[in-house]
């Protein structure tokens, strides 16, 4: 099992502080990073990814690609960015049909919701962004890196 190194923790994150947190997350990612975004249903995975995409100077966020599974963006500052929502993936045959393994070979940034559904094809080294809802409904975000 790979060890995870905690890179940063943000507490009491709200909609008003999320853009600054997103900027800080970008500063910690390596080029062409793969980021598994984890959290309970409703924790704010899609909202957090939207903030990250907006910080990459992409004006129009398409929303969660729940039915399409993959949404591609072209950023003037970060090149290609993929947002994946793997919630609907049910088996390995779907992974093969979607061509996700080949997609992960691209030189791009990847933000993946429900990555546990594709754990067998996750890149060896990647980032984990955990989102938890606090009792006051703010969020705590923790960024880890496999090493």
Features from the language model and the residues they span:
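N-terminal pre-Walker A segment at the start of P-loop NTPase domains
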Residues: 2-24
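Conserved lysine of the Walker
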Residues: 45
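P-loop (Walker A) phosphate-binding loop of NTP-binding proteins
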Residues: 38-40
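Phosphate-binding P-loop
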Residues: 26-32
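Short phosphate-coordinating micro-motif centered on Lys-Gly-acidic
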Residues: 3-11, 57, 93, 101-147
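Short beta-strand-centered segment that lines the nucleotide-binding/catalytic pocket of NTP-utilizing
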Residues: 58-73
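Short hydrophobic/aromatic beta-strand immediately N-terminal to the Walker A/P-loop
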Residues: 34-36
